[in-house]
UniProtKB/Swiss-Prot annotation:
It comes from Homo sapiens. PANTHER family: RAGULATOR COMPLEX PROTEIN LAMTOR5. This is Ragulator complex protein LAMTOR5. Homodimer. Part of the Ragulator complex composed of LAMTOR1, LAMTOR2, LAMTOR3, LAMTOR4 and LAMTOR5. LAMTOR4 and LAMTOR5 form a heterodimer that interacts, through LAMTOR1, with a LAMTOR2, LAMTOR3 heterodimer. The Ragulator complex interacts with both the mTORC1 complex and heterodimers constituted of the Rag GTPases RagA/RRAGA, RagB/RRAGB, RagC/RRAGC and RagD/RRAGD; regulated by amino acid availability. The Ragulator complex interacts with SLC38A9; the probable amino acid sensor. (Microbial infection) Interacts with hepatitis B virus (HBV) oncoprotein HBX C-terminus. One of its GO terms (biological process) is positive regulation of TORC1 signaling.
Length: 91
């Protein structure tokens, strides 16, 4: 699984508008990261996804957290116990 995750991280970073990607488990443990997103961000990203999920009563509704700034967006979503964050530069 680790090799597959590493390949997905590398493939994601091939997109020129993406400058960072991070995967974390539900405990905030960094499973892998590239670019602008690092180990220090894993806990916060995991908690943001968990807190956003509490805002909906529909368990099948999986929210996307989007942090916007002038320099770009960080999109965060949880998938089957793994939270993925992607840092995309503004176009």
């Amino acid at each position: 699984m680790e090799a597959t995750l590493e390949q997905h991280l590398e493939d994601t970073m091939k997109n020129p508008s993406i400058v960072g990607v991070l995967c974390t488990d539900s405990q905030g443990l960094n499973l892998g990261c590239r670019g602008t997103l690092s180990d220090e961000h894993a806990g916060v990203i995991s908690v943001l996804a968990q807190q956003a999920a509490k805002l909906t009563s529909d368990p099948t509704d999986i929210p996307v957290v989007c942090l916007e700034s002038d320099n770009g967006n960080i999109m965060i979503q949880k998938h089957d116990g793994i939270t993925v964050a992607v840092h995309k530069m503004a176009s």
